[in-house]
Amino acid sequence: MMSAVMNVGKIAENGGTSQTVKSPSKSPAPNRIGRRNQETKEEKSSYTCPLCEKICTTQHQLTMHIRQHNTDTGGTDHSCSICGKSLSSASSLDRHMLVHSGERPYKCSVCGQSFTTNGNMHRHMKIHEKDPNSTASTTPPSPLKAKRLSSKRKFSQDAEMDREERTPAKKVVEDGQYGEGDRKEDDAYHCPVCFKDFFCKYALESHMETHPDNSLRCDICCITFRTHRGLLRHNAVIHKQLPRDPTGKPFIQNNPSIPAGFHDLGFTDFSCRKFPRISQVWCETNLRRCISEFHRFICETCNKAFPMLLALKLHTETHVMDQGRDKHKLQSTSLPSENPDQKAFMASLGLQYTKDIKPVKQEDDTQDEVQEMRLRALKSNLPQEPGSTGLLSLSPLEAATMGGPFSVLPPTKENIKLLSLQPFQKGFIIQPDSSIVVKPISNESAIELADIQQILKMASSAPPQISLPPLSKAPSVPVQSIFKHMPPLKPKPLVTPRTVVATSTPPPLISAQQASPGCISPSLPPPPLRLIKNSVETSSNSHLSQPGAKSSPSSQLLLQPKVEPLTQHEMKTQLEQDSIIEALLPLNMEAKIKQEVTEGDLKAIIAGAANKKAPTMRKVLYPCRFCDQVFAFSGVLRAHIRSHLGISPYQCNICDYIAADKAALIRHLRTHSGERPYICKICHYPGTVKANCERHLRKKHLKVTRKDIEKNIEYVTSNAAEMVDAFCSPDTVCKLCGEDLKHYRALRIHMRTHSGCQKKKPFECKECGTAFSAKRNCIHHILKQHLHVQEREIENYILVVDCSAQESHTDAPLLEDSTYMDCKPITPFLEPQNGFLLGTSSHVPIKLEPMGNFPMDFDEPLDFSQKSKNLSAVQVKQENLLVSSPLSFYDCSMEPIDLSIPKVLKRDNDIPGEARNQELASSVITDNAYNWQQCPLGFGANGNSEKNRAVGHPQPLKGSLHLTVPIISPALLGNSALLRPLRPKPPPQPLLPKPPVTKELPPLASIAQIISSVSSAPALLKTEAADASPKAASSSTGCDKSGNAKAKMTIVTAIQRDSNLPSDLTQACDPEPSPIADTGLTKKRGRKKGTKNKPKLSSGVDLESSGEFASIEKMLATTDTNKFSPFLQSTDNFKEESGQNGTSEDEKETPEDKLLRGKRNTYSDCPQKITCPYCPRVFSWASSLQRHMLTHTDSQADTEAPATGGEVLDLTSCEKEQPEEVSELPGSECSPQEEQKADSPPAEEDAEEKADEYEEGPEEDSVSNKSLDLNFASKLMDFKLAESDQSAGSSSQTERKHACDVCGKTFKFAGALSRHKKAHIREDRKDERSSEDESKSIQDDAGAPSMQDSGLEQEESPMDLKVVESPLDCEATGKENEESESISEGEGTERKSTEKSSDDKIPKTDEAKSTAKADKRKKVCTVCNKRFWSLQDLTRHMRSHTGERPYKCQTCERTFTLKHSLVRHQRIHQKVKNTRNHGKESDKEETQSRCGEDSENESSHSGTNPISENECDFAGVVGSHPSGTRSRKESLVGAAKDVPCEEERPSGQGATADLVEPAKSTQKQPAKDQEPRGSSELERPSGFIQDLLEMHNKKSPMNHILASADSTPQLLGVE
């Protein structure tokens, strides 16, 4: 009945019970629902145990008794014997038993409220520490505090009605709060009907029964109310009637039925400039008592209380105006009206005199506020001066000028009543930037905000867009700058993309995120694209627009639907009007900066920019007013502005919280958003952080193992990733690739990876010429690599290079490819599809990449067909002296740079005379390539260029460095692209026409292997062989990453062999193939380690960037032991199968080799082993194999350029791409090199894989396959291949059942055997070739070896090709090789090693989207996004990107990535002596034994530098025959097409000791025989090669796939 009205003074029921003494029995009133059940339990004279029926006299006894039941059970799981709930500890269980006994042993000494725990009581006691009368009047709690308040002790909300709807616990606690205030005031309970005073609530309740007929009904309109408070408010708001005492005076401040305090005003911030006005209107509508002893702002006229003096003054003015209005009514007949001009002026401002307002005074006040708020809602996305009064209180007249319908603006009475009856219970949040945000808050939260339905009703008639009048109509004085703006109250949308909400977000979150502050009113459609014109855009629009597009759309980016666009001056003025301090505030930027563009205009712009339909773009762009950057999110802009102002980038936009890092900020933001992304799959309990969810699973569901816990945690991707992106502070975000590096220092280090120029590495080691970006890195290098240097002399070994001289050389060529080279300080930004804002050069004509070419769905292949149509439109300065003009569009500049390549100009200073002369000859060809940091153009599987990351080139950045934050565009979020990291689209650069290739190919041999073996998807790849030849050749056109002319020549020959490719490509790649250039580069390049078959991803481009390939990352993340079951085998089977099921040469493996390998294996005694399908390593755990598998993809890539000079073959076979084509080549083309390839030990293959990896860049294997370095072949002929049986252990290769008569090799298929025999025959034919066509051989070799290499690759098992530097390299060039190598390696090494320190542990921001489930491998490579289990794995992997080789051989100064590689290499030095002494037999035996070791060790770590290990070994063996190399090279000219691979075999022979049966006779020749052998080697049976070709063609698709990755081309020599 009426007792609810009296709850004002109640103390919580649970406060009335003591621990052991029962409270006096009471008769609860019918509607007292507080703890009714609890009370009845307390009233009982006895308490019964639910388990054993024992009767206890007190609750405490019952508690102690039921606790004994728990100990009786003796369980260790701490589960409740009554309800079975499992708790974490015995103490928690004891505390839990209070729930069943009902005892609340801890009681507040002030208010009597009782609690189950001491901590809860003490927390409660804090509310009594201050005088409650002084707590609330002047300092409404902050939104966060108020939110916390609501759950624990909700102060009286506006309506008793609301309290009745709340849960009993909350209501009771709330009542207790009222009681506190009242009792301190007058310790009495008042009857709201007769105003009698009572000393206890029970007396009051009894008294209320004497008023049974007192119905709460309005006397005027007969509306009935459930609570007295509701009636009071109704009378005050509707009828302007205030409660009055018997004398007729307003009776508010002493009326106990009126709520005390102003806590309800917590919906807005008291620091808000409009707070006095808001509080005045609100307190006039909602009667409140002032409970402060000191700050009592009470109106003497109407007895209303206000929280602050200013609100009271505003209120008293209304009384004065009322009086004035009464006088005015009396005088209205005689007095003339005010000046009509003045009235018109006031009306134009949306103002009128209050005396002209209708008598319903308070309602009109509310009406003003409502109108103001509605205008805010309507104009929230309009640029304006935040807080400018002219725009805030727009009259209908002004609103009409703004394009809004007249009818929308004047609020109707219904709307006013909606708000006045429930003032702001679910109200607006008025933002400091004049925008309004609406978010429904659940009843439990303290800040009750606007009901969505109300707002929808009010905003329903709003036009989709209300455009701003020209700025001149807006007041130009920054009114709000006088005030310190309040921080935004409403949880902002966490700076998530406004137009996209993750589908998995729970519904409340969706509405919360969509209602973005100051952006979009809930009922309005998202505003269309807004493009802000930059001061520079006008000059660059012609360059930015598509050739076919008209310039008008691009030059008029400031399209507005209904008003004239702002001029640049107006925009500048508008931005300048904002004070700096506003930049601190989250929201005030949005309204000023945004401009509307209709969807039609947007389509016109897009249609103009791209000839085909483009996917949807971001709707809004936000320019920075301090620099020229443009952002797609206001949150990103705010974060960016903080960086201008030196404020922490990780500052909460909602409150004052400043996080130390982004992760802490994200966790904090969840407290505002309510987001709980970690969900228990069993009971759907959500957690804000994973640890909470894990604890929940352990405690509640008894999940103890990590596997069970992980399995039952679901991560709901709502907006965390977008939050991350939005909070990317531009001072930590890479502008070129969008990567957020978390720290500015890491960003600086990272930026070096984009500027591949030597000038970024000013510190050079005088010993080896390696350049470093930081001096400390150079010192570290000297300490580790040059041990003879004393520490005190280190400074003398560091050369500081001045780069200014080189810039002049590089500038001109760089103009062609430098997307980011800005001569002007301001760079206009276009927004590409993938959401990264890329700057385009404002002065260099550059073809804009048609946006339509880049599908939003990354699963689609890229479509570059537009490129081939518009190539003529590309305007590029033609700087290349030797490239013909038609080919000027095809430059090295179009390819991803190889960061480890030293610049030619830089190297010129260091190269001694002889090499220098030769280099100059070649530098004519390669000069531009160096200047442009040659980027091999990788073609994707369908022949399209792989998505090349926009990487900086060696030019200086002339403008200020603009850091752009990664943006997620809506289309991206909606599609499968969420599953992989967001990648920048390739920069607008012209690319080659699409080659005539129709089939997609796997990007890497290793990927093909893994897909076929792990995912059992051979069908994915089996049909792709036919197209390989044209593809491989065309993709090889990219300049070799090592930047030498040799690579170009070999590429050219490959292209020439391919009739499908335009001849001009050949010209571009091979302008002047000359032996001199070849040798010069050979010498110059020195010892480069090859890398594995996978592309180097230093620029961060993901392998799946084009969407064409399976994600190895995802695949491995989901593999389990079962997937590897084919590779499980017992220890016995292991030795047996490794011989039989290995590669075709496995039968030759000697028992000693197997034994060695068995000893080597860490898990050799393990009962079951998992053999890596791609190398001989064996693992006891599937997880170890999974981790190791990455070494066959991206993990261990050596990022140094391969030594094109001769040490390193481009060893990847392109066979997987050309299985059919190879057989169609002239029979002679598959030379002994293929035999060698077929027979080389696994270590060889590993090395070859690595060699490729480097050259490929983001290309497929075929690219580097075609780029086989021919000089290498010529040098290899100086070496013996010691015979060795290779140990492969690859279970992917099956048994061979057919043996070759000539070499004893076995094959699985008869057809393969017959082809193999033909190869022997063909080899004989080849030997008859003369040596006079050397240059031709050199050119043609490039294509043939790579194609031939692929031919045999399928049968061969992994081989560790030990390639040794010829004397020509080791001795003739000597130091040059080291220098060139270390420089190219060093650049990559230092660039990434410095970056690695801060980056390698930091997962990319977008990683959250890259996998559907959380990947347990927490260490993520920042370059290629590969994941690793441990930091050690990642560190080792990073060396593949950086080129770091921390281990150095003291004998030959070779450097190695892995320590065990160095150890193995040092063994070679010992064995080389024996090789020289004992001749061919001992050589053979040693290499046999070492083959097992090397193949195992090298492949086990993906052999980051297998090739380098033996190079020096054989320098001695062949050291005295440099002329032999030259003569052999000449002799190869004639045999180039027939013996393309043959030449390389000898160099591998003596040197590598990784040999094969077929090469025995050759191997047995002493080193001295090698020189004459230049021609003799040509006499090998060509039938063997023919045989190999046939075998290759008939190979099964699976074998072909596996072989292509497993056995990269081995150099076979057939005697």
Swiss-Prot record:
> Which residue ranges does the record annotate as region Disordered?
1-44, 127-169, 511-556, 1025-1044, 1058-1104, 1123-1162, 1214-1269, 1313-1418, 1464-1585
Chain intervals annotated as zinc finger (C2H2-type): 47-69, 78-100, 106-128, 189-211, 216-239, 297-319, 622-644, 650-672, 732-754, 763-788, 1170-1192, 1298-1320, 1419-1441, 1447-1469
Locations of Polar residues compositional bias? 15-28, 535-549, 1123-1132
* Highest taxon of the lineage: Eukaryota
Q: Which GO terms describe its molecular function?
A: DNA-binding transcription activator activity, RNA polymerase II-specific; RNA polymerase II cis-regulatory region sequence-specific DNA binding; zinc ion binding
Q: Impact of mutating residue 932 to C?
A: In strain: Leghorn
| Transcription regulation found in the keyword field | yes
Composition bias, Basic residues:
145-154, 1082-1095, 1464-1477
Please describe the organ and tissue distribution of this protein's expression.
Broadly expressed, except in brain.
Q: Composition bias, kind Low complexity: at what positions?
A: 1026-1036
What's the name of the protein?
Ras-responsive element-binding protein 1
Species: Gallus gallus
State the encoding gene.
RREB1
